[in-house]
């Protein structure tokens, strides 16, 4: 928001000698940051004076252009004979060439004389052009860097604000330059500062001076006027239609209006547009003007019909959404409420009668509409932040009065439909601001601050009953008022106090567990990666997973970074596959990489409710939202390819295989003290004969093994690439909370080896578990050290060889005790697994 200081001073009684820097500092400390201070006309130097055109002779040129040879009175000082004039001896004035069509006899103009320097370092000097010595320049607004003037050069009335112009006097004070303009960064929560009225109120409060409110009126209720209006939507609380007729649209806009809106960052167009923009900048209330002759029947405020179209002022045919709020007449939609008007009722050069619209629209409705149509405007920026509802009527009346004053219009009676909505009420403890801000502000000062902010305050004991002013929709709950008090006393007055130490709680059990797991995987030789959490249909097709797999339950992004990957990942493997292929393209062929991260699986079809923003959602609504969220388990995955150990002088290379994939899961389980069971399984994308299910506490938490050749080919991975993926949250949750530390026995160990023959379908883990049960408490450890399949054990049979370590806690085991324990273990394996002792 750009704030010209002269406009600000029209509303605020700033003390004499108040500098712009002081105003900027006060505004920054209490309300919004002043990003910079611009100086309009600050580059102008030299003689720039008021001139009076005594004569103007049009002279057509060969190129078809018409120039004016003007004799300009610039006062006794600059008309003197000592200055070059290029006109007859004894004749007053200077000769100046000008091509502007409004350089006519009798006009009062701004003249840059030789020696003046304009913006960009453009120096003025006498020079011969079009057959004459041009002794200066008649200036346009853009040439002075103070605005835009499509009519040509600047022309002034003979009297400006009661001052009779005199040829030769300094023109810059007449033009109001140089003028300082504040560039204020208005954040979304202080939408009322999108107006001069709002900024002026904040400056007055910050500097403890008087504020003159040009829109200080009481709310107006329904009024039956000549324009028929029907409001059919709750998204419009009040609508004002004010007819203005007999208007001369060709009348020039007063210079004070064009100067102010130009310095505020807007371009002058014509009287109606300039006046509505001026009032919007002044009050914060957007207005819209309809050509009354093109409005048929009743003006209706309603939601758009399905498939309805509107040709907007930017000449774009828009298909409306049923949630769009529109202004319509008997012919259909004539405007997108709060955003942009329609071309059918646009004010043109032939317009003589208009209907001024002032309305209060729902901020969310306007915000959604302009985002839906990608049609931001000055009006929508203000409506979405909240507009003072009282100004809907007062701003329309103000604009109509200006049109009557400067355009000769006649103002009719307004039609007012709806009421100004009531503002929220709140009760707070008088000491709440001090408790939250850490200040010691007396209650009397709190009341004074809120009252100056426009809040109606009623003190009852230790409580303050508060009613927000109409221009402050941001004051809703108690803490909004606390923030208001903090801003108004100045955050620079609040001393920095370190919060008391609550004692370090440390990491949670889950955090400690995850760190141990990640550290163990890194120590095993793997490199951690972080990949983007997005996948596409092609990624899922590469994995070869079935349609009912939970990894197909994707969450689609509304605005994906990459249209080919519009889903949140349901597995970590695609990201690792992309990372591996990228590294291979850079000649990195031996890779062992892993990633831990969240995946997202929409396993519940429920849709999350959309609560309003005006109140806290209930516990039931929050529970429904949580229930509709996708499952988000934290997973760990790794991919291994190439050589596990490269060729070296003391041995051959070791190729990576499925055992290294299983190693990742085993290392993770060992780091947590969790018993991991591995069992043959079939699961995409792994090879059906080289895939192990990873089981903890009887539940499958993941899989490991060699990838299916088809998957390897589609993903562009090296042959025999292996992978593992498991639920890290489930593994960490299974970690024991504590354990018993067994005493270290000083007695020798007894070692027994057994080789058992079982069917190929029997899992080695089942045999191992049977041996543990049969051996009893003397078994210290057991290890599978050999697997054999061949003629010696028969078809569909395999031999599993285990090493049993036996030790007594209080004695040395005898040979017979060791043999008995071994036999008991074998007997249990025979009983449960059908195992036979291999001879």
From Swiss-Prot:
CDD domains: PheRS_beta_core (cd00769), tRNA_bind_bactPheRS (cd02796)
The protein's enzyme class: ligase
B5 domain span: 421-496
Domain tRNA-binding: 42-166
Cofactor: Mg(2+)
Pfam families to which the protein is assigned, alphabetical: B3_4, B5, FDX-ACB, tRNA_synthFbeta
Entry GO MF terms: ATP binding; magnesium ion binding; phenylalanine-tRNA ligase activity; tRNA binding
Domain FDX-ACB residues, every copy: 745-838
Binding site for Mg(2+): 474, 480, 483-484
Primary localisation category: cytoplasm
GO biological-process terms attached to the record: phenylalanyl-tRNA aminoacylation
Keywords: Aminoacyl-tRNA synthetase, ATP-binding, Cytoplasm, Ligase, Magnesium, Metal-binding, Nucleotide-binding, Protein biosynthesis, RNA-binding, tRNA-binding
InterPro entries: aa-tRNA-synth_II/BPL/LPL, B3/B4_tRNA-bd, DNA-bd_dom_put_sf, Fdx_antiC-bd, Fdx_antiC-bd_sf, NA-bd_OB-fold, Phe-tRNA-ligase_IIc_bsu, Phe-tRNA-ligase_IIc_bsu_bact
Co-factor remark: Binds 2 magnesium ions per tetramer.
Catalyses which reaction(s): tRNA(Phe) + L-phenylalanine + ATP = L-phenylalanyl-tRNA(Phe) + AMP + diphosphate + H(+)
Subcellular compartments: Cytoplasm
Enzyme Commission designation: 6.1.1.20
Gene Ontology annotations for the cellular component aspect, listed alphabetically: phenylalanine-tRNA ligase complex
NCBIfam families: pheT_bact
UniProt xrefs under PANTHER family: PHENYLALANINE--TRNA LIGASE BETA SUBUNIT, PHENYLALANYL-TRNA SYNTHETASE BETA CHAIN AND LEUCINE-RICH REPEAT-CONTAINING PROTEIN 47
Subunit structure as annotated in this protein's UniProt entry: Tetramer of two alpha and two beta subunits.
Family stated for the protein in its record: Belongs to the phenylalanyl-tRNA synthetase beta subunit family. Type 1 subfamily.
Name of this protein: Phenylalanine--tRNA ligase beta subunit
Gene that encodes it: pheT
